[in-house]
Structure formats: structure tokens, C-alpha cells
């Protein structure tokens, strides 16, 4: 049962957007998916409450913000959305569960500095050897200098860059209905599906 953790200590980098869409991808493949939310804001849980009955099922993994335990039997794939400022024993508990960690990163100097420290902590963690870590650029406008700086930063990390997701209203509109880019006709989100190809391939390894 793969456990995918979406983590970055910086708030507002797109963790919930990434977590819900990763869960949506697994659900689109017919897996028994649980989406856990260790963030006190419970954004992912709220999103699940908006999900229409006709959509592919994604179950709620009841994660107490102060106690993270393994999900129930019968689950084939788990996605865990984590809060900003994740550290200490909660950080350790999350990484004990993780098979894969996706770190979302925005093209901002503040995000880059905060994420660099976090990636160093991941590399030094005692469970680092069993985790795969990948980077996803979030809300990236490829035409900007900031995007170029982000690419320069991630290319020097020695970690796989899974993809760059553009800044689009598609994610906002779909999230408001409890949906993901994997729940609608591909023709409606063609550019976004192209950007997800590398992420999906990495998730399936």
C-alpha cells in the first residue's frame, strides 16, 4: 500500500491542490484511495465533503492532527496532506509512513529558501533511505524570470523534478466542486493533463 505524503513547511504552496489531484489520479485508475488531512485547517477533508456521489470514490482517512496512525485495511493507496510548519515528532510520524514524498514549490525566493532547509531535513532523516522524494513546481508561469530561477534551483538539488503545474483557474473551479483534473473530460484540461504526465509516471513506479 503506497503512502504518498505531500509536504512543505511553507504555507500556501499548493499542498492541498496537489494532494487532492494525486488522490483523484489514483481513483481514476480504480484504486481504493484514502485521503488523509493532518492539517488543522482540514482543507482536504472539506474538499471531500464537496465531492459529488457520482465521482469516483475517495475515502476520508481520519487523521488526528496529534496522532497519525496507519490507515485501515482494504486501502490500496493513501495520500496525506500535511500542514505548513510540519516539524518535530509529527514530522517523524509522517515520514515513518511515507513511501513517496512530493514537495510542492512555488517560484518565490521565500519558498525556495524555506524548501531548501526542508529538503536538507528530509535527506538527513533516519527514514530517508526508504522514501522517494520528488519536486513539483506549482503555479509556474514559464514566461517569467521567477520560473527560470525556480528551474535553476531545482536542477541543482539532485532530486527528480516531476513537473511544473501552471497557474490556472481550472484547479480552483474544480476544487470548488470536489473534483480534480482527472474527473472531467481530458479535452477540458488538455494542457494540465500534459503537465501531469511526469507526475503520474513517477507515482506509478
Predicted features and spans:
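P-loop/Walker-type NTP enzyme "switch/lid" segment
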Residues: 2-13, 20-96, 175-183
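Beta-strand-loop-alpha "switch" segments that mediate conformational coupling across diverse proteins
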Residues: 141, 151-182
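NTP-binding/hydrolysis catalytic cores, primarily Walker-type P-loop NTPases
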Residues: 181-205
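Hydrophobic anchor at the start of a short beta-strand
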Residues: 32-33, 78, 132-133, 161-162
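Motif I (Walker A/P-loop) of helicase-class P-loop NTPases
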Residues: 16-20, 115-116
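Conserved Switch II/interswitch segment of TRAFAC-class P-loop GTPases
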Residues: 98-117, 141-143
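Conserved C-terminal guanine-recognition region of P-loop GTPase G domains, centered on the G4
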Residues: 113-130, 138
Amino acid at each position: 500500500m503506497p503512502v504518498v505524503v505531500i509536504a512543505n513547511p511553507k504555507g500556501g504552496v499548493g499542498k492541498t491542490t496537489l494532494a487532492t489531484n494525486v488522490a483523484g489520479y489514483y481513483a481514476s485508475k480504480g484504486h481504493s484511495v484514502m485521503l488523509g488531512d493532518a492539517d488543522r485547517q482540514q482543507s482536504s477533508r472539506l474538499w471531500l465533503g464537496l465531492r459529488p456521489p457520482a465521482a469516483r470514490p475517495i475515502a476520508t482517512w481520519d487523521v488526528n492532527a496529534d496522532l497519525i496512525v496507519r490507515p485501515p485495511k482494504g486501502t490500496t493507496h493513501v495520500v496525506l496532506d500535511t500542514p505548513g510548519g510540519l516539524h518535530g515528532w509529527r514530522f517523524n510520524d509522517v515520514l515513518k509512513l511515507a513511501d513517496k514524498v512530493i514537495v510542492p514549490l512555488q517560484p518565490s525566493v521565500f519558498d525556495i529558501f524555506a524548501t531548501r532547509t526542508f529538503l536538507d531535513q528530509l535527506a538527513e532523516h533516519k527514514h530517508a533511505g526508504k522514501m522517494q522524494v520528488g519536486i513539483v513546481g506549482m503555479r509556474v508561469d514559464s514566461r517569467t524570470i521567477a520560473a527560470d530561477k525556480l528551474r535553476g534551483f531545482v536542477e541543482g538539488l539532485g532530486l527528480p523534478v516531476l513537473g511544473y503545474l501552471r497557474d490556472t483557474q481550472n484547479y480552483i473551479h474544480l476544487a470548488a466542486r470536489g473534483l480534480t483534473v482527472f474527473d472531467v473530460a481530458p479535452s477540458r484540461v488538455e494542457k494540465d493533463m500534459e503537465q501531469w504526465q511526469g507526475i503520474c509516471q513517477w507515482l506509478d513506479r
